[in-house]
Amino acid sequence: MHQPAEVARALVALQGVGRDFDVSKPWLNRVVERAPRQLLTAVDDFSLEVRSGETVALVGESGCGKSTVARLIVGLYPPSRGRIEFDGTPQTAPASGIWSEGVRRRMQMIFQDPYASLNPRWRVTDIVAEPLRVQGSLARRADLQARVSELLTQVGLSAADGEKYPHEFSGGQRQRISIARALSSTPEFLICDEPTSALDVSVQAQILNLMKELQERLRLTYLFISHNLAVVSQMATRVGVMYLGRLVELADAAALFSRPRHPYTRMLLDAIPDLDMSGRPRTPVAGEVANPLAPPAGCAFHPRCPLANQRCRAERPKLSPAQGTLVACHAVEERRG
């Protein structure tokens, strides 16, 4: 299990962050049908700190809000409510999600699909150098070329690869190019949005090893988003479990994988194949995620939870300490499971 050299300050802090999307019908349809506007809450009351040097992973089923949190942090989406800070500095224009130029240089994002995130009409040199050109940090072309060659070598490619186009590379090599581009502005914080999910298993291991080496060498901080708990177990210092836009459990990786507290976390871990054939009882993930346009009252997980009671159906649980972890669950609080 990966551990940082030391636990330091909170580099990124989210406090009560929420994000709503307007999914209403067109205005004329609403007038004719006398229908109200409709909002979809993708993230709700989300609070998290990412400390310098660590890797925090966010896990959960598709549609739980993991990628929305990533886009809120980098400013691709403005938050509907709440506060986001980077190293103590809030967004300069929270309503539009804008960071100051100095903050933008210190955070970058690695996207999920290396086939879609690279411009097929650009050479690799231009792709990697784009952030440097935008920031104007290297004016001379010779300096720019030297920096690109250094970055490509750093991620396991050759300087000569800079003259090629993305279609000449495999999926794993394309993701290395994406990592080189993310590192070009010398960031401290990288958001990794399922960076290995589109890759073969053998290539996944190579990319994960590269990311761990770069973290140790460059003292990087990661927010690692994934639905693959086997990958998360190799990368994470702490793990946050999301369900329907809310954080339901946050714990050190070792504690979460050895003793999960929330029923949803247990179900996710039980879905991992048991290669040891231990014969331990397993609870499969039952049912489907609720409709986010009409979430259930109380705990959003109660329709799928074997431990749910009347309180779960009526009262939304808050994230509270429970034996060294943070859990939002009435059953854990009442020691029913």
Please provide the spans of the model-predicted regions.
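Short catalytic/signature loops enriched in Gly
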Residues: 1-10, 23-34, 39, 250-337
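Helix-to-loop junction immediately C-terminal to a conserved catalytic motif
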Residues: 74
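Conserved ABC transporter NBD signature motif
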Residues: 82-93, 103
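Conserved ABC ATPase "signature" region
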Residues: 142-160, 269-270
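Conserved ABC ATPase signature
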Residues: 165-169, 173
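Conserved catalytic motifs of ABC-family nucleotide-binding domains
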Residues: 186
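P-loop NTP-binding/switch modules centered on Walker-like glycine-rich loops
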Residues: 191, 195, 199, 203-280
